[in-house]
Amino acid sequence: TKSDLPISSEMLNFWNDNGYLIIENFKTNAECDDLINRSKELIEEQDFNNQQSVFDTVSQSHNDDNYFLESGDKIRFFFEEKAQLNESNLKKNKQYIVNKIGHALHDLDDKFIKFSKNHDLNEIAKAIGFQDPLLLQSMYIFKQPKIGGEVVCHQDSTFLKTEPESTVGFWFALQDATKENGCL
């Protein structure tokens, strides 16, 4: 029989036992392509000459960076640590020097709003125990070839602190991970 839950009871049990859940093909290829293309457009529209904030999870130098700290309600761009931020790269190679875009894409960009604020995602959040799920933060994280920074082992709750713990991250792989595109 069909369950009223948006996920099966087996999936819910797996979530409860392991703290994560993999849902294959939750989003269509077209929906994923929309975000990939939109991220490229956002980068092309951005003038990076007056902004050079670097994001890396090892030294976490961004923790003292107001551009980063004040990004919760904005769309902001953060560079790879190994990116050469010269005039040529800031104009010609813009697509390959950005580490991530964050943190309010889900509130400020139509394509990301459509992807993030939908019934299915809300229902999954409710199925895993959230009574009134809210979107707090969104990021588009790049895996840049040859210069992509290391992401050290971490839990998102380290960065998004609530008491009691009440946050969960939804992570979407927009492309298949391969050796050619910087697999995880």
Question: Could you tell me what each predicted segment is?
Answer:
Residues 1-17, 24-153:
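Non-heme Fe(II)-dependent double-stranded beta-helix
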Residues 20-22, 171:
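Short aromatic/hydrophobic contact patches that present stacked aromatics
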Residues 108, 122-126, 147-184:
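Catalytic core of non-heme Fe(II) oxygenases with the double-stranded beta-helix
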